[in-house]
Amino acid sequence: MNIVLETSGLTKRYGRTEALRGLDLSLVGGKVTGLVGPNGAGKTTLLQIAVGLHHPSGGRIRVLGLDPWRDGVALLSRIGFVAQDRPLHGGFTVGETLEIGRRLNPRWDQAYALARVKHFGLPLGRAVRSLSTGQRAQVALTLALGKRPEMLLLDEPVANLDPVARLELLEELMGVVAEDGPSVILSSNVLADVERVCEHIVILVGGRVRISGDADELVRSHVLVSGPRLAGRDVSDGEVIEVRQAERQTTRLLRGRAAPSDDGTEVRPATLEEIVVGYLRSEREEVPQ
């Protein structure tokens, strides 16, 4: 099995704040993994440690079999990273930015990078500071993809993009994955985008993995059980993830299986969005069993 990212007891502290708290995770290569969680869950911290920008406070991490802190030079030539704030030098032109990419990356594909910025109508002589948010996002993604990476790590790549620009970027990402097959970790809180492109889902809460699994398997293994008299129903055949109370109805997200009954309850498959939201909300309240 090709494990591209593996952590064991990974911790990261900033003063008294623990951003990662003994995080254990193993991701198989060749997939697009969606990393989701509330603000402060540790998503950005995990990606920054994975590319060697921060040193962990404890535990172990391996990316493509390498230690990001100790083997940073060797690792960076094999991965592409787009940070959340897409830090590009505003004084450089698009062409100069690509030239820097060419000089710093031994696997750089200049023909591909030039073709990509041309496709998106980005003049090589135009200053980066004059580009729109969507155009800067495309330049940042070009820098990552021009390396022809084995692994691509994207931290909120569609944040602040308009709907058309967001859709174009995601379609381009899917095309790259289909053509070149890099492993991808996509951090995003836009659940529709995660559902559109991700094959594997990791829900991160409080610096720990709440659940990790293939999207199809998560959908198969979760159901919503709702009805007016649900409080007395036996749900011992599964784990209750979340309970929502309405005026006359109770709905439970259940990890497991439940059979319909004649007491007015309804059982249906949960959508991926309902599963993700259920896990995130369950961390804010005690779940009655």
Where are the language model's segments positioned?
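The feature captures the beta-strand-to-loop junction immediately N-terminal to the Walker
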Residues: 36-38
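ABC-family P-loop ATPase nucleotide-binding domains
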Residues: 73, 83-139
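Conserved ABC transporter NBD signature motif
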Residues: 27, 59-70, 75
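ABC transporter nucleotide-binding domain
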Residues: 167-254
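Helix-to-loop junction immediately C-terminal to a conserved catalytic motif
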Residues: 51
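Catalytic Walker B motif of ABC-type/P-loop ATPase nucleotide-binding domains
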Residues: 152-156, 161
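Conserved structural motif at the start of ABC-family nucleotide-binding domains
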Residues: 5, 20-22, 76
